[in-house]
Amino acid sequence: MHFLKKSIFLVLFLGLVSLSICEKEKREDQNEEEVDENEEESEEKRGLMSVLGHAVGNVLGGLFKPKS
């Protein structure tokens, strides 16, 4: 009977450990995906701001250009 209790505890313990490891990896994967999405969004914003900056610069440059 004592051997059976130890076996059951061992199986339950190993099951909980493996479940814990799987959950941890799943959370890490989700965090990596969120970081990747945030990086893509920030790159899009930087690209948009760069394009807008050039457009505004061209417009202002055209307005203040000395007329010949």
Swiss-Prot record:
This is Frenatin-3. Its main location: secreted. Expressed by the granular skin glands. Residues 30-42 have a biased composition (Acidic residues). It comes from the Eukaryota. Belongs to the frog skin active peptide (FSAP) family. Frenatin subfamily. It is found in: Secreted. Forms an amphipathic alpha-helix over residues 47-60 while the C-terminal eight residues are more flexible and less structured. The flexible region may be responsible for the lack of antimicrobial activity. Residues 26-47 are annotated as: Disordered. Antimicrobial peptide with activity against both Gram-positive and Gram-negative bacteria. Antibacterial activities have been tested against Bacillus cereus (MIC=12.5 ug/ml), Escherichia coli (MIC=50 ug/ml), Leuconostoc mesenteroides (MIC=25 ug/ml), Micrococcus luteus (MIC=1.5 ug/ml), Pastewella haemolytica (MIC=0.8 ug/ml), Staphylococcus aureus (MIC<l00 ug/ml), Streptococcus faecalis (MIC<150 ug/ml) and Streptococcus uberis (MIC=50 ug/ml). Strongly inhibits the formation of NO by neuronal nitric oxide synthase (nNOS) at micromolar concentrations. Residues 23-46 form a propeptide. GO terms for cellular component: extracellular region. Coiled coil: none annotated. Residues 1-22 form the signal peptide. Keywords: Amphibian defense peptide, Antibiotic, Antimicrobial, Immunity, Innate immunity, Secreted, Signal. InterPro entries: Frog_antimicrobial_propeptide (IPR004275), FSAP (IPR016322). GO terms for biological process: defense response to bacterium; innate immune response.
